[in-house]
Amino acid sequence: MKTLTPQYEDNNSHVPNLVKKDRTLYITMDHVMEENHYIKKIFIIRENEVIEYNFTPEDEIAFAFPYSEEIKVYALCNKHGLWEGKIK
């Protein structure tokens, strides 16, 4: 099993876009969704819960999720690994 270490870099298409409005967290990606290069998974971690969303190259990534103080969001690119989002 390979250990994945999250990366973070502002203005990088691999980093999930996270916008908090009221009690909702809006999650989008600017990443390409092509057969050879796409976001495979989004992980939402809050309190004692891990929620995993799986994607295909045909999918568009844009959804809302209830906000909590302890939330973390990661995106997994099939080529470039794991990336951590920061709430803006």
Model region roles, listed by residue range:
Residues 46-54, 83:
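Surface-exposed loop/edge segments in extracytoplasmic proteins
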Residues 79-88:
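Edge beta-strands of extracellular beta-sandwich domains
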